[in-house]
Amino acid sequence: METKQTDLVIVGAGTAGMTAAIYAQRAGKQAVMLEALSYGGQIINAPDIENYPGMAHVSGFDFATALYEQAKELGAEFRFERALSIEEREGSKAVLTGKCTYLCSAVILATGAKNRPLGLEKEQQFIGAGISYCATCDGAFYRGKTVAVNGGGNTALEDAEYLAGLCEKVYLIHRRDAFRGDERDVEKLRQKPNVEFVLNATVTELLGENRISGIVVKDKNTQETREIQIDGLFIAIGQMPDNTAFSKWVTLDENGYICAGEDCCTGTAGIYTAGDCRTKTVRQLTTAAADGAVAARAACAEQS
């Protein structure tokens, strides 16, 4: 197995991770970024970003690509490998993947979060057969059809708006009577004749044999249930972190997020965290970028 020496290893290439790489390279440190999937994280699927200062309208893909190219131009190295564990070796941190061992002085964990499932029977079976977690990835398959979006945050609202431009009918299902996302986006959806809000309701059952054909939703107030016939279900009920591989080195809260304050310090020398994977009240592109800058500066200062 290959062994590589570097100053800093950043686990995760989302907004936080790539911002950390930019700041590290500008500080004269060599950063290696490890990403199991694609750069950009969850934002790469957003059709339009309106809440990042200085960028009134930009797609998630273009935003992520700009960060990626900026970090690369500054000399950051990207490797598409999954970080499996961290070890201590003769005063250095060793980050192990299936292909290489990276020796470094500091590690920034910017692993982000993954889509949260409903946890219903047949959910895994129907992935790719009517169930999706990415409207911009799979929405075109449902052009002219009837779909449902389950969720109440900005992602769900963005998904519903995007799908409303493709689909004959969009049901937007939320367990509360008010959405958590931006009110401006809610008002946009209210004006669309092919979008129907199903509030105070939860999806309790997935219908279909080889692919989804409908859902059962339960009204939280009346306890009554109804069947809704759909061709596709887009699940956008939030995210959950995946930090268990690093639990030896950092403290995780009850939900699996890395415990750290605004200084992005984990309490373990040489290990920092940034972005959606850490404990915080606001998870936005701006806060992820801020975390990346803070974590990188702290990691670089420790090496000075």
What does each model-found stretch correspond to?
Residues 6-74, 157-182, 253:
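Beta1-alpha1 glycine-rich phosphate/pyrophosphate-binding loop at the start
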Residues 14-15, 38, 113-115, 153-155, ...:
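Residue-level detector of alpha-helix initiation sites
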Residues 4, 71-96, 101-102, 164-261, ...:
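A Rossmann-like FAD-binding core segment of flavoenzymes
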Residues 2-5, 140-146:
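Short helix-loop-beta connector
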Residues 13, 111-112, 237-238:
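Glycine-rich, N-terminal phosphate-binding loop of Rossmann-like dinucleotide-binding domains
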Residues 119, 125-141, 237-286, 291-294, ...:
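FAD-site-proximal beta/loop scaffold in flavoenzymes
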Residues 78-143, 152:
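Glycine/small-residue-rich loop that forms an oxyanion/phosphate-binding "nest" at active or ligand-binding sites
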